[in-house]
Amino acid sequence: MEKKKTAVPAFLGVAAVWIGSHFGPGFATGAFSVRWYVKYGWVGLVTPLLAMFVTGGVMYYMLEYAREHGTPGYRPFARSCYGEKLGGVVAVLYDVCFLMTMMCAGGLAFSGEGKLLQGFLGVNYWTTAIVTILVSAALCLYGSKLLAKSSGYMMYAIVGVVLLITVLALTRGDCDVTGAFANSAANAKDSSFLHAILGAMQYGCFQSTIVFNVMSVSDVLKDKREARKAILSGYVITIVLMVCLIFTLFSYTNVFDVCAETLPVMAVLNRLGMKWLQWLYVILMTLAVLTSAAGLAHAGNVRFDGLFQFIPNKQLRRFVITAILLGIAAFGAALGFQTMLQQGTSIVGWTAIPVIVIPAFTFVAAKVRRGA
C-alpha cells in the first residue's frame, strides 16, 4: 500500500526538533540575540552562519551515525562509536553535558516564559512550570514519531509568527535601520570583530548540546539522504529565524538600548502598540517552550528509560522521567534568567567543545565517511 502523505515529512520533523530545541525562550525572547549577536553591531547579522555551521556539522555526523547504527540513545551511541570501555566513559560525559543542558536550556525556557506570562498576564511562575511539564510529558508519551510530527506543526507556526513580527516591526514601528548601520560601532556594547567570531563559535558549541534531542528521533529517517535533508532544512530555517530576530532588534539599537532589556523582543512590540501582536508573541513563546522542553525530555526518556523499568507501564514511565527531568529544569530557572543566560550558557558551551564538538568533527565524522 502507498504510504499516506503528511504535512510534516520525516526529515522536516527531525529538523523541527532541532529548530524547536534551539528556538527556546532564550532565543525567542531576544535574550540570546543581544547576548551573542546584536551587542557586536552589524557583524552580528553575519556570524550566525558560522555558529550554525558548527552546530549543523555536529548534528549531521552524530545524527547519521545514530541512524545508521540504530542508536538513538546517546549511551548506546557512545558504546557503539567509541567501544565498550571508552564508550562507557564517554557516556558518562554525555550524561553530564545532557543534564547541564537540561538545567540551563530548560531553565531558560521556564524562566523566560515565566517572566513573560507574569508580566503580561500576571500568571504565577510555578503555574507556568507545572503546565509546561504536563504538556511536554504528554508529547513524549508516544515516542519519536509523535514528537517529530508535533514539533513540525509547531515549527510552521513559529516561522510564521517570527516573520510577521519582523515585517511589522520594520514597517510599522519607529526603527532606524540606516542609523543602526551608521552608528553600529558607537551603539555596539563590544565592537571587537574577534570577540564576535569567538562568541559565535561558543554559541555554536553551546547549541551543539541539543544534538541528543535530534539523535533521539533518528529512527524516523530511512537513509543518509533524509539525514542530509533534515540537517540542511534545519540549518536554513534556523538561520532565517535567527537573522530575522537579530535584524529586528539591531534596527532599534539607534532608537533605544535594546541590549539592556530582559525581554528585548517584547520591548520592541510594546513600541508598536499592537495588543493582538503581543498576544501572538505570547503564543509564540509558549510554542517555543513546549518544543524546547519536549525535545529535551524525549532525549532524556530515550537515555534513562532502562533505569525506570520497575515501572511496567511504558506511558507512565515516560511521564515520570519527563516530570523529573523538567523538574531539574525548573530548579535551574530558580537560579535566575540572567545567571543561566550569562554563566550557564558559557559553562555548557565550553564543556561541549572537548566532549561533543571536537570528537564529532573528527572521530565520528571519520566513521560516518567510512560507513563504519
Where are these regions (language model features)?
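Transmembrane-helix boundary/entry motifs in multi-pass membrane transporters
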Residues: 2-10, 39-44, 68-101, 119-125, ...
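Extracellular loop-to-transmembrane helix junctions
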Residues: 6-9, 35-63, 233-243, 344-357
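Hydrophobic, membrane-embedded alpha-helices of multi-pass small-molecule transporters
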Residues: 7-28, 101-102, 169-174, 182-239, ...
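Transmembrane alpha-helical segments of multi-pass small-molecule transport proteins
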Residues: 11-21, 46-53, 91-99, 119-143, ...
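Hydrophobic alpha-helical segments and their helix-loop junctions in multi-pass secondary transporters
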Residues: 25, 136, 140, 157-187, ...
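Juxtamembrane transmembrane-helix boundary signature
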Residues: 49-76, 248-255
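Membrane-water interface regions at transmembrane-helix termini and the short interhelical loops
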Residues: 109-119, 133-154, 220-223, 328-343
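Membrane-interface interhelical connector segments
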Residues: 249-275
